[in-house]
């Protein structure tokens, strides 16, 4: 079984000394049947005075670092080794009642899924509704897995990948209008489109790898950095992973770190500092994914 090694380094530089506030890091994957952690490491420079671990509302592992004193830099290096046991698309088994659109979740599931089923972004002219419903009509029989595969492929084929360093995400209608976006934007577009069909979805933050291309200087779109994709809840199959940036289904090339109801809740690093208004100089991010 392949062992994956991930190293994620984030560096902040400041022109003048600043005082660091609390920083929250979503960097440690959860052990599960599909991802077994072997070891993990978190190195912080300057060292934090207090480092504690908590589970957020979604069950993600969050490191909370506190600091004293001033500094002109902050380096956060997270690394882990893990074995990956991804689901293959052909292994997905959906309950009979959910094999075709339309269907409804059971009463208990509907309550527990809560706001993950609800639309979060404005669609006053029902443009996204029409876009999603058209996919259902185009798929013979309206099979659930087939519609979601078509949606994943449509985003990959019709929209142009355009990485953005800016924080946040584009609204789904903006991504459709521009015809381009980052992996975060594509993930959010698919989340909201699936919610148009009554499905529960979650935003996933993690890493992308292609074992065949590691070390070859090329890879899937979005590799070499943090990556974003989607989980859709399907009765019988559970939370199924879809990457619309690369038209991937089932998680073979996806290393999940955290999940959230909305992209704003899944930042790998968030924090603050106190200092002069022009103190911030630069930020750099480096991600290495290798196998052993």
Write out the residue ranges for each language-model feature.
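Hydrophobic/aromatic-rich core segments of domains that either
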Residues: 138, 153, 185-273
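Structural beta-strand/beta-sheet cores of well-ordered domains, especially the beta-sheet scaffolds
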Residues: 2, 8, 21-23, 40, ...
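A general structural signal for short secondary-structure boundary/capping elements
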Residues: 55-58, 71-73, 124-127, 273-292
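Glycine-rich, small/acidic residue-mixed loop/short-helix segments
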Residues: 25-35, 42-43, 246-280, 289-292
């Amino acid at each position: 079984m392949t062992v994956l090694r991930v190293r994620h380094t984030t560096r902040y530089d400041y022109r003048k000394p600043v005082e660091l506030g609390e920083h929250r890091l979503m960097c440690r994957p959860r052990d599960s049947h599909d991802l077994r952690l072997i070891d993990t490491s978190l190195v912080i420079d300057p060292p934090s005075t207090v480092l504690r671990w908590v589970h957020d509302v979604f069950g993600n592992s969050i490191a909370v670092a506190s600091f004293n004193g001033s500094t002109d830099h902050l380096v956060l290096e997270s690394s882990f080794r893990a074995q990956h046991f991804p689901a293959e698309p052909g292994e997905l088994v959906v309950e009979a009642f959910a094999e075709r659109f339309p269907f409804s979740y059971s009463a208990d599931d509907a309550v527990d899924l809560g706001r993950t089923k609800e639309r979060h972004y404005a669609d006053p002219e029902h443009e996204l509704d029409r876009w999603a419903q058209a996919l259902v009509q185009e798929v013979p029989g309206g099979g659930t897995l087939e519609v979601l595969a078509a949606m994943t492929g449509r985003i990959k084929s019709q929209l142009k990948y355009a990485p953005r360093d800016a924080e946040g995400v584009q609204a789904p209608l903006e991504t459709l209008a521009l015809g381009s976006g980052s992996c975060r934007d594509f993930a959010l577009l698919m989340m909201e489109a699936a919610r148009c069909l009554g499905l529960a979805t979650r935003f996933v933050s993690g890493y992308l790898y292609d074992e065949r291309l590691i070390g070859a200087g090329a890879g899937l779109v979005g590799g070499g950095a943090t990556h974003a994709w989607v989980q859709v809840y399907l009765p019988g199959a559970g939370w199924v992973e879809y990457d619309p940036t690369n038209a991937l289904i089932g998680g073979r090339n996806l290393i999940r770190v955290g999940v959230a109801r909305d992209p704003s809740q899944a930042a790998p690093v968030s924090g603050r500092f106190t200092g002069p208004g022009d103190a911030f100089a630069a930020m750099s991010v480096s991600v290495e994914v290798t196998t052993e």
